[in-house]
Amino acid sequence: ELFPYTRIGRIGFDDTIIAPRPADPCFITDTTFRDGQQARPPYTVKQIAHIFDLLHKLGGKSGLIQASEFFMYSAKDRKAIDTCRARGYRFPRVTGWIRANENDLRIARDMEFDEVGMLTSVSDYHIYLKLGKTRRQAMDDYLRIIERALEWGIVPRCHFEDVTRADIHGFCLPFASRLMELARQASMPVKIRLCDTMGFGVPYAGAALPRSVQGIVRAFTDEAGVPGQWLEWHGHNDFHKVLV
């Protein structure tokens, strides 16, 4: 058991060394206006617009900062979205974030989003204890909403929450493979964000799944066939390991 309730999570090693293969192209998707607000008092619309201008100035002109994501639930959220859209910037693109249910998806459709992030939790901790579902129920529910998004012309960006505590080969890769099938059928991208929700990801050579960052990324690209440009890494609380 890598993640016991009573002790610090363990790191497994299988001595598999993965050669570096940098992303091409390399880009950033910004989450300042979504989870960036969860650690501080919420931004005002004026502050959001100012930060959005700075993001455009910093990397939006070149597309290095490719997109920003926004909540869309409150009147303030929607006003901020309208204000940033009115800037007319090509980058960062304004994208949404929702829970994986049809009511939220309807909000995204009504607000004419062409891409939206969906919370698709993948660890057993989240599936069984937070959602109260089985793996099969969770996957079926996720796929149903993703299919509906594609029907409505919305590119889904599936946020694999808590991926570094998940069963990569038993759940994540089969789920990702189904997403790639849907993408082929719809002739539309289905993007995946790998979310290290608890900060358990490690960059160490020889580290094993599910904690090896390079192992997770390579599994999605090589085993599930996810194109690199559809794949994002979303690190939380990396405790300076990004410097390793």
Residue ranges and their predicted role:
Residues E1-R34, Q38:
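N-terminal amphipathic alpha-helix/helix-capping segment at the start of soluble metabolic enzymes
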Residues I18-I28, R40-L64, T83, R87, ...:
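Alpha/beta enzyme core
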Residues R34, T197, W233-G235:
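Short glycine/serine/threonine-biased micro-segments
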Residues D77, R165-I168, K241:
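Alpha-helix N-cap/loop-to-helix initiation residues
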Residues N237-V244:
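Thiamine diphosphate
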